[in-house]
Protein backbone atom coordinates (compact mmCIF):
# COMPACT_ATOMS: atom_id res chain seq x y z
CA UNK A 1 0.00 0.00 0.00
CA UNK A 2 1.19 3.48 -0.78
CA UNK A 3 1.50 5.93 2.12
CA UNK A 4 -0.54 3.79 4.52
CA UNK A 5 0.79 3.86 8.06
CA UNK A 6 0.11 0.41 9.49
CA UNK A 7 1.12 1.55 12.96
CA UNK A 8 4.34 -0.44 13.18
CA UNK A 9 7.08 0.80 15.48
CA UNK A 10 10.73 0.11 14.67
CA UNK A 11 13.42 0.55 17.29
CA UNK A 12 17.06 0.88 16.21
CA UNK A 13 19.59 0.80 19.04
CA UNK A 14 23.24 1.47 18.20
CA UNK A 15 25.56 0.03 20.83
CA UNK A 16 29.21 -0.38 21.68
CA UNK A 17 30.81 -3.00 23.88
CA UNK A 18 34.14 -3.72 25.52
CA UNK A 19 33.50 -7.34 26.56
CA UNK A 20 34.91 -10.17 24.49
CA UNK A 21 33.09 -11.08 21.31
CA UNK A 22 32.50 -14.59 22.68
CA UNK A 23 30.84 -13.21 25.81
CA UNK A 24 28.65 -10.86 23.77
CA UNK A 25 27.57 -13.59 21.33
CA UNK A 26 26.91 -16.01 24.19
CA UNK A 27 24.63 -13.45 25.83
CA UNK A 28 22.77 -12.62 22.60
CA UNK A 29 22.31 -16.20 21.41
CA UNK A 30 21.76 -18.08 24.66
CA UNK A 31 20.37 -15.56 27.14
CA UNK A 32 18.76 -12.45 25.71
CA UNK A 33 17.13 -13.73 22.51
CA UNK A 34 15.53 -16.80 24.18
CA UNK A 35 14.36 -14.61 27.07
CA UNK A 36 12.81 -12.01 24.74
CA UNK A 37 11.11 -14.78 22.76
CA UNK A 38 9.66 -16.20 26.00
CA UNK A 39 8.26 -12.78 26.97
CA UNK A 40 6.97 -11.67 23.57
CA UNK A 41 3.68 -12.10 21.76
CA UNK A 42 2.53 -11.72 18.15
CA UNK A 43 3.27 -7.99 18.28
CA UNK A 44 7.04 -8.54 18.18
CA UNK A 45 7.84 -9.00 14.50
CA UNK A 46 11.65 -8.79 14.64
CA UNK A 47 14.37 -8.81 17.27
CA UNK A 48 17.66 -8.99 15.40
CA UNK A 49 21.29 -8.28 16.22
CA UNK A 50 24.00 -7.06 13.85
CA UNK A 51 27.63 -6.84 15.00
CA UNK A 52 30.75 -5.20 13.58
CA UNK A 53 33.48 -7.28 15.17
CA UNK A 54 36.28 -4.89 14.19
CA UNK A 55 34.81 -1.80 15.85
CA UNK A 56 33.06 -3.69 18.69
CA UNK A 57 29.77 -2.04 17.83
CA UNK A 58 26.35 -3.54 17.35
CA UNK A 59 22.88 -2.62 16.22
CA UNK A 60 19.77 -4.14 17.74
CA UNK A 61 16.71 -3.93 15.50
CA UNK A 62 13.26 -4.43 17.00
CA UNK A 63 10.05 -4.21 14.97
CA UNK A 64 6.62 -4.22 16.60
CA UNK A 65 3.18 -4.52 14.99
CA UNK A 66 2.05 -1.53 17.05
CA UNK A 67 3.09 0.87 19.81
CA UNK A 68 1.20 -1.07 22.47
CA UNK A 69 3.21 -4.20 21.67
CA UNK A 70 6.41 -2.22 22.19
CA UNK A 71 5.15 -0.88 25.50
CA UNK A 72 4.00 -4.28 26.80
CA UNK A 73 7.30 -6.01 26.01
CA UNK A 74 9.36 -3.13 27.41
CA UNK A 75 7.33 -3.33 30.61
CA UNK A 76 7.99 -7.06 30.92
CA UNK A 77 11.76 -6.93 30.38
CA UNK A 78 12.94 -3.66 31.96
CA UNK A 79 14.70 -4.28 35.26
CA UNK A 80 14.98 -8.05 34.78
CA UNK A 81 18.35 -9.78 35.32
CA UNK A 82 18.74 -10.21 31.54
CA UNK A 83 18.03 -6.51 30.97
CA UNK A 84 20.51 -5.52 33.68
CA UNK A 85 23.18 -7.73 32.10
CA UNK A 86 22.43 -6.11 28.72
CA UNK A 87 23.07 -2.72 30.31
CA UNK A 88 26.35 -3.99 31.80
CA UNK A 89 27.60 -5.41 28.51
CA UNK A 90 26.59 -2.59 26.18
CA UNK A 91 26.71 1.18 26.05
CA UNK A 92 23.79 2.72 24.17
CA UNK A 93 25.26 5.15 21.66
CA UNK A 94 21.98 6.07 20.00
CA UNK A 95 18.36 4.95 20.13
CA UNK A 96 16.02 5.79 17.26
CA UNK A 97 12.31 5.03 17.28
CA UNK A 98 10.56 5.02 13.91
CA UNK A 99 6.85 5.40 14.49
CA UNK A 100 4.85 6.71 17.40
CA UNK A 101 5.34 5.18 20.85
CA UNK A 102 2.68 5.70 23.49
CA UNK A 103 3.03 8.70 25.80
CA UNK A 104 3.67 6.50 28.83
CA UNK A 105 6.41 4.62 26.98
CA UNK A 106 8.00 7.91 25.94
CA UNK A 107 8.28 8.77 29.63
CA UNK A 108 9.67 5.35 30.52
CA UNK A 109 12.41 5.42 27.88
CA UNK A 110 13.19 9.14 28.14
CA UNK A 111 16.35 8.33 30.14
CA UNK A 112 17.74 6.75 26.95
CA UNK A 113 17.21 10.06 25.13
CA UNK A 114 15.69 8.46 22.02
CA UNK A 115 15.25 10.22 18.71
CA UNK A 116 11.62 9.71 17.65
CA UNK A 117 10.72 10.00 13.97
CA UNK A 118 7.07 9.89 12.91
CA UNK A 119 5.86 8.07 9.81
CA UNK A 120 5.75 10.26 6.72
CA UNK A 121 5.05 7.98 3.78
CA UNK A 122 6.27 5.14 1.62
CA UNK A 123 5.31 1.64 0.57
CA UNK A 124 3.97 -1.01 2.96
CA UNK A 125 3.38 -4.50 1.58
Residue positions per predicted region:
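Short S/T/G/P-rich N-terminal loop/turn motif that feeds into the first structured element of a domain
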Residues: 1-58, 65-76, 88-125
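A short, acidic, amphipathic alpha-helical segment used as a generic capping/interface helix at domain edges
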Residues: 78-85
Amino acid sequence: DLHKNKGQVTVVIDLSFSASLDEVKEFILNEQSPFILSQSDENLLKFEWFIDEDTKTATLLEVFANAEGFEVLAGKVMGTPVNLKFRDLFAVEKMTILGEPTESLKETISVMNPTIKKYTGGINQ
